[in-house]
Every structure is written in C-alpha cells, then in structure tokens.
C-alpha cells in the first residue's frame, strides 16, 4: 500500500547503512576541513569559521554513530576510508577552485624574449633580471599571477623555454599588480577564463 515505509532490518541497518553513513559523513567533514584551512590561509575571516561549524558538527554525528555501534568493525574501516577519501576530494576541489595568488619564478638558460613578450602581451606583470649560472648567462623572470591562470603560464614556459627551471610559491596578500582580463565562465567552478591574445 502506498505511503507505508517497510521496516528496515536492524542487522542490515547496523552492517550496511551505518558504515555507509559514517563513510559519507567523513568525506563531507574532511573536505570541508580542507577548504576551511585554505580559507584561513587566505585570510577569509567570515567563511572559515562557518565552515568550521559544519565540519565539527558532521564529525560529532559520525563519531556518535561509531560509539553507538562499537561492535561493528566496518564502522572503523568506513571512518578511516572516509577520512582518506575526503582528503583526496578536498585537494581536487582546492585545485579546481584555484583561489588566491602565486609567485612564479622562471630561470632560463637561453634567450627568453619570446616568453617575456608573450606574458606581457597576455596581460601578466613581468619583472626580468639578468643572471649568470653554471651554464652561462640567463634571465630570472618574476610574475605574480592568479592561481587559476597558472596553467596558461606553464603552457607558455613549455612552449617558448621548455628547459627553463621554474618554481611556484603561494602568496597570501599582494597590493596592486597587473593581471590578465577575465570573463565569467560557464560554471561556478570556472571563476573566469583568461583572454589570450594572438601572438
């Protein structure tokens, strides 16, 4: 008859439903925790505490289910597996969001004129210093870029100076700066795309 919810077998609930719930809850709270740490490092004082509230709330619910079902070893496995999976998903989300700024330092061993011209034409602020390394003269190129634009800069390095050494450092705060023009992307995770100019 419609509207009647069948009783769930207690053994099935204990052995299947509870471990699955714990697994999913751990994924959620660890993913939120990863994002909270990122927002704290970015100095976002409003979002970070809010995420912290939901993180600890979900964690308490998950731990409460374990204490109510201490005899089921699947709960412990689900707890650990959810923690590991949550870390992985959190890193994927962080990479997708690509929030904040990064300092990229490029050291070239040959002429870097084309790379420098491309970066400046694309709208990136570039500072160039003369350098001298083991294999002779070169250039050290500094640029502060939005993390969502890092792929564009790395592609340019691989195209114009494929053997150049470069390193990337996160920046918590920066004043002024020159960045490429962006337009809104089609999805919430796009956060704009770089308008690449022709070479």
From Swiss-Prot:
It is found in: Cell membrane. The keyword Metal-binding does not apply. The chain crosses the membrane at residues 12-32, 47-67, 73-93. It is a multi-pass membrane protein. Keywords: Cell membrane, Membrane, Transmembrane, Transmembrane helix. Its main location: membrane. Pfam families: DUF2179 (PF10035), DUF5698 (PF18955). InterPro entries: DUF2179 (IPR019264), DUF5698 (IPR044035), N-reg_PII/ATP_PRibTrfase_C (IPR015867), UPF0316 (IPR022930). It comes from the Archaea. GO terms for cellular component: plasma membrane. NCBIfam families: PRK04164.1-2. Belongs to the UPF0316 family. This is UPF0316 protein Memar_1511. It comes from Methanoculleus marisnigri (strain ATCC 35101 / DSM 1498 / JR1).
């Amino acid at each position: 008859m419609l509207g009647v919810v069948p009783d769930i077998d207690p053994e099935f609930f204990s052995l299947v439903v509870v471990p699955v719930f714990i697994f999913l809850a751990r994924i959620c709270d660890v993913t939120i925790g990863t994002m909270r740490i990122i927002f704290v490092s970015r100095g976002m004082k409003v979002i970070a505490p809010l995420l912290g509230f939901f993180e600890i709330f979900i964690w308490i619910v998950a731990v409460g289910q374990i204490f109510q079902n201490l005899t089921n070893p699947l709960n412990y496995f689900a707890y650990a597996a959810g923690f590991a999976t949550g870390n992985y998903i959190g890193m994927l989300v962080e990479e997708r969001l690509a929030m904040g700024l990064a300092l990229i330092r490029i050291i070239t061993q040959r002429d870097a004129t084309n790379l420098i011209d491309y970066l400046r034409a694309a709208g990136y602020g570039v500072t160039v210093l003369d350098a001298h390394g083991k294999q002779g003269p070169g250039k050290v190129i500094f640029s502060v870029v939005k993390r969502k634009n890092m792929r564009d800069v790395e592609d340019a390095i691989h195209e114009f100076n494929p053997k150049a050494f470069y390193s990337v450092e996160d920046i918590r705060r920066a004043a002024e700066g020159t960045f490429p023009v962006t337009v809104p992307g089609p999805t919430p995770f796009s956060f704009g795309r770089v308008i690449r100019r022709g070479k």
